[in-house]
Amino acid sequence: MHAGVTGGVHRGGKRRLRNLLLGVQLFICWVFISLAAALYLQSDKTGRTLFGTLSLEEKEQILSIPMDFSFMNAVQKQDLIHQFKNLSGVEEVLPADINYLGGVSGTGMYTEKDNKGSYVDVNVMRITSGFFRFMHIPMRSGHTPRESSDLVIDEALSHRLGTDIMGKPLYNFDGDAYTVKGVCQTFVSSVYYDSEGFIFLLSGFDDYCGHCYIKCKEGQAETVFQEVRKILKKTLPESVEVKVSTFMDDIRESQALEFKLRGIVLFFSVVVLVISLLGVYSAVTIDTEYRRKEMAIRKINGAGMRQIVWLFARLYVTLLTVTAVLGFALVEFLLRQFSTLYTVFFQHGVAFYFCLFLSASLFVALTVAFRIWQVSRVNPAEEIKRE
């Protein structure tokens, strides 16, 4: 009798330890799955927000080409751009002095001439006349710049300067005057800080061109990509690396934190999920084998499939719920810290966690149900005879 009691205590201790370890596995699983989903949702959010006047599909159809070649003069670069324009799959070409994700043409202008106290901290971009059409940026009032002395500001700067800014001059560091001719939608080039606003000035880029964007016709991006590379390889010295990417590639590179990290976290999420499911399958197998006789007696006494399932499933329902609450609490804390890095962040409310809980619980439920279904097919009379 003493040996039986000791054996029962020993088995109970092992079962509690097993359940504890399984709970730890599920907790880790919830954390990784939640973080993977969060990173994918946030990367999608930032990808859509940056230069949000363009769709994700349009960003994939725009090629981005660095042209900061010290060995080429402005005329040679213009000739290179002309070759790009002549490609059959090209819809439009947009020269720039810098990658739009890498900085701006300048900063700051004055609202009053020769008055340093009127300085306004703002991003200044040189653009061509086709910039607003290329980027699908709508005008809120006025019109796009038509003369070299015209400028356009975005809504973020308009709110800072006041609604009566239209038609008024702004001055550069040399005292040259530019007249505000229009206000466009806020230009978003970063999700890490709130924009001070943008000023857009006309330029022909005859003096300097450090970058070029090519908008491809629908379905022609890959063909144009290869043709552009051929032109660059033919034109550039062999020692210069040919670099051609898409606008979306540039965004992924600038948002490396979420775009690169999400793949790593997703991989570990899959690994942890598989390990957790194997742990659940192993645990329910041991439980069903240990309680086969009890299950047989219950079936003889009229217990249905629902009662048999609940006999084993309630432990895993409890484990799933408790570990999910703890895991989601940790993830919510991490996401709130993470969100302070961004000006925009995806919605991670109750619906986010509820969908995650349903998705992961479905895998666990199928695992448990499959094993219980296998055991429930056993003839109870034969099982009792065997015992």
What are these regions (language model features)?
Residues 16-42, 259-293, 321-327, 362-366:
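Hydrophobic alpha-helical transmembrane segments of multi-pass inner-membrane transport and secretion
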Residues 119-198:
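Hydrophobic secondary-structure segments that place a key small or acidic residue at a functional site
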